[in-house]
From Swiss-Prot:
GO biological process: tRNA wobble position uridine thiolation
Binding of ATP, residues: 7-14, 33, 119
Enzyme class (EC, first level): transferase
UniProt protein name: tRNA-specific 2-thiouridylase MnmA
UniProt organism field: Microcystis aeruginosa (strain NIES-843 / IAM M-2473)
Gene: mnmA
Length: 352
């Protein structure tokens, strides 16, 4: 079946991916990325569990020191984004810049194979009609992670296996039990790895961004209160604003130049369209004329009908059939045609 390098986080999903491929006859090599800096991070529970799974399967286990890359591509990316008044999406950036491309490069250069695999819930297929590999949603819609994978390249799709894409999470747990894997009953991660390491996103950001008090204002510029840093807020936020008002107030804009948080009613946080930059058309060639599709503007939001209008400089304008709440600069807008991920990019701004 050939050699495959399996990315192992120490969780049940990647463990089952490795065990399933091993059972199918693949020559499996486990690979764990060492991402976090700081005391105690060299021997995290995930790294220990990944090593145990490889020992259990009788396969080699490699650890790659990716701490500097993670610092540059994720931590610095997050901090600079929040300082600029946007809400970055670290997971898609991490998949592109820290995980998949570097893993495939390591597999080719060090382990002499062109194939990697992970425990992500998504699918890949080749389309002879388009002569391209296509990224698809997973069978388990509740666990589907295609939203975070839109920025992968054709080269990465060509060399990647997603063994869990055709099964449900319940089936993954059952298979883990059948294999007797140590991670079979390990709870799923509930937060970003950074949040799990630091407690909350606020506590993580406060390590890097100095407190800078400013005004909370309404849409007319009237000062309603004070904030301790715009990085503590995100578009659409209602809870934790700290302003008493006759009607619920939502964050509708962050102004890093004036260091202001602008709030308004729910209607003022609704947008009919938005601009998206840094587009990556993962499954199709870049369109030159408008297309009809569906778009997902955050991970747990449903995909909604949209007109996609190509613009210059790798941008598109998305015009929603129905205005959408809380369009957040820095987050991903991922464009689908049914179960196929056409492409995606980073939201740069919303229009009323």
């Amino acid at each position: 079946m050939g050699k495959v390098v399996v990315g192992l986080s120490g969780g049940v999903d990647s463990s089952v991916a490795a065990a399933a491929l091993h059972a199918q006859g693949y020559d499996v090599i486990g690979l764990t990325l060492w991402l976090m800096k700081g005391k105690g991070q060299c021997c995290s529970e995930g790294m220990v569990d990944a090593a145990f799974i490889c020992e259990q399967l009788g396969v080699p286990h490699h650890i790659v020191d990716s701490r500097e890359l993670f610092q540059k591509e994720i931590i610095d990316y997050l901090v600079s984004g929040y300082e600029a008044g946007i809400t970055p999406l670290p997971c898609s950036q991490c998949n592109k810049a820290v995980k998949f491309s570097p893993m495939l490069h390591y597999a080719r250069e060090t382990l002499q194979t062109d194939t990697i695999a992970t425990g992500h819930y998504a699918r890949i297929r080749f389309s002879p009609e388009n002569n391209r590999y296509q990224l698809l949603r997973a069978v388990d819609q509740n666990k589907d992670q295609s939203y975070f994978l839109y920025d992968l390249t054709q080269d990465v799709l060509r060399g990647t296996l997603f063994p869990l894409g055709e099964q449900t999470k319940a089936e993954t747990r059952r298979i883990a039990q059948e294999f007797g894997l140590k991670t079979a009953d390990k709870p799923d991660s509930q937060d970003l790895c950074l949040i799990e390491a630091h407690g909350t996103m606020r506590s993580f950001l406060d390590k890097y961004i100095a407190v800078s008090e400013g005004d909370i204002v309404d849409l007319d510029g009237k000062v309603l209160g004070k904030h301790s840093g715009i990085h503590h807020y995100t578009i659409g936020q209602r809870k934790g604003i700290g302003i008493a008002a006759a009607e619920p107030l939502y964050v509708v804009k962050l102004d890093p130049v004036m260091n202001r948080v602008i709030v308004g009613n729910r209607e003022s946080a609704v947008s009919a369209a938005c601009l998206v930059g840094r587009m990556n058309w993962v499954s199709i060639a870049e369109p030159t004329t408008p297309i009809r599709a569906q778009v997902q503007v955050r991970y747990r939001s449903p995909a909604v009908p949209v007109n996609v209008i190509p613009l210059e400089n790798n941008q598109v304008k998305l015009v929603f059939d129905q205005p959408q709440f809380s369009i957040t600069p820095g987050q991903a807008a991922v464009i689908y045609e049914g179960e196929i991920v056409l492409g995606g990019g980073i939201i740069s701004g919303a229009t009323p």
